[in-house]
Each structure stands twice: as C-alpha cells, then as structure tokens.
Amino acid sequence: DYLAYSHNLYFDIDTIRFFVSGFAASHFEILEGLSGTGKSSLPRYFGKFTGANVLFMPVQATWRDKSNILGYFNEFSKTYTETEFLSALYKANYEPDAINIYVLDEMNISRVEYYFADLLSVLEYPTEDWKIKLMNFPHDFVPPVKLEDGYIRIPELSYFVGTANRDDSTFTITDKV
C-alpha cells in the first residue's frame, strides 16, 4: 500500500512473487512490457525495501560491446577507463554479504547480445566461476587489489534485471538471451 499511496504505483502480489521467485531460478531477469508500466520501478523499490544496493544503467543505442559496461584500457594513457557498473562491481567484492541488483534500463534499445555477451555467458557457470576478463596487464601495470590476472569476480549475491520496452524503437530480444 505504501507505493500506491506515496508514488501512485501498484504491483499485485503475483507480480512481486514472480519477481522474487525469478531470482531463485536465475540471477538475470527481463521485465518486458509497454512503456510506463513500472518495469524500472519494481527493482528500484524492491531494492529499497530489502536494503539491496541497486545500480541503474540506462542503456544507450550506441552500445556495441562490453566496454560500454566494463570500461576499457587506454593504451595511450596506460589507464583503465572504468564505468559506474565496474566501480559498483569492484565495491561489491568488498561486501560479499550485500545483495547487489544491477538494472539495465531499456536494455533492448541496443542489441543485448553485443554489449552483455560476456555477462550472459558467465552467468551460466557455477557461481564460483563468475569472473570476467577485463584486460591483459601491460608489463609495468600495477593492478587493483581485487583483480586476479585481469579478471574481476562477480559476487554470488549479484542479480541483473533488464527492462525492455515493446515498441518500434527497440530490438527484439533473441532466444539466446
């Protein structure tokens, strides 16, 4: 009732049950529907009520590869350009008991298979193998503490939610996803 009165939002009990039980089956959920139906609000307020860390990543139409989510190493400056997601993931490695929800808002405005492929693949493995290759270290590069041979771990309590609109401005989400 809190959301209905304070934010003009209402989720029926079955919607909330399906959302929560979906996380028991998979660490990746897609909420698909028409614009304005509360797809983004559900994970936002779920995180608020459960105390989970929630990061919203508004997907851009220009996203083409993993660098849009994970950042990239700049050979010229010898620095790693990190994203807000990578920073949050790195921080989550220091808080293994915290629940982290990463929301790809309007995920199908770009092709999911391009920018999210590495994460889709990793999430199919057992949780102890959840790590993503960020880079090969140059000879004189001093890596951050939580990177292991160029890989960053995805903590077990990490969950991914994609919101997807069903309209002419978006791509169809393939069966692979």
Model regions and ranges:
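AAA+ P-loop NTPase catalytic core and its hallmark functional loops
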Residues: 1-177
